[in-house]
Amino acid sequence: MARVNLYISNEVHEKINMIVEKRRQEGARDKDISLSGTASMLLELGLRVYDAQMERKESAFNQTEFNKLLLECVVKTQSTVAKILGIESLSPHVSGNPKFEYASMVDDIREKVSVEMDRFFPKNDDE
């Protein structure tokens, strides 16, 4: 195990001491808990967090590209479904049924979407 001397602020020293004292109050023995061991544990934890952040930065994931691709797929799907609804509304099997008129279907879809969107993104009174 390597030995390292480092300087920390008084505030950090106090916080580490508070952790040690709390652990002792919880029943840890003096040989089980120490300032050095606690500081080492916190340093290791900090290094894990640092490594995780560096991995995230190096990740090939690009949020902007993902959003662009997702929006493109949504727009294509919306356009395709609109065409299919238009074709279906002209079918002789549903002609004369107001439930399957194109304008009625569009209004029904918009209403259902609005209800679902409000469920996840409630409107504020400020808007």
Curated annotation (Swiss-Prot):
A GO MF term: DNA binding
GO cellular component terms attached to this protein's record: cytoplasm
UniProt-annotated location(s): Cytoplasm
Disulfide bonds: none
Entries under Pfam families matching the protein: Tra_M
Source superkingdom: Bacteria
Keyword terms of this UniProt record: Conjugation, Cytoplasm, DNA-binding, Plasmid, Transcription, Transcription regulation
Main location: cytoplasm
Similarity remark: Belongs to the relaxosome TraM family.
Functional description taken from the UniProt entry: Conjugative DNA transfer (CDT) is the unidirectional transfer of ssDNA plasmid from a donor to a recipient cell. It is the central mechanism by which antibiotic resistance and virulence factors are propagated in bacterial populations. Part of the relaxosome, which facilitates a site- and strand-specific cut in the origin of transfer by TraI, at the nic site. Probably autoregulates its own expression. Plasmid specificity is conferred by the TraD-TraM pair.
Subunit structure: Homotetramer. 2 homotetramers cooperatively bind to DNA although they do not contact each other; cooperativity is achieved by DNA kinking and unwinding. Part of the relaxosome, a complex composed of plasmid encoded TraI, TraM, TraY and host-encoded IHF which binds to the F plasmid origin of transfer (oriT) in a site- and sequence-specific manner. Interacts with TraD. Also interacts with TraY.
Protein name: Relaxosome protein TraM
Organism phylogeny: Bacteria, Pseudomonadati, Pseudomonadota, Gammaproteobacteria, Enterobacterales
Gene designation per UniProt: traM
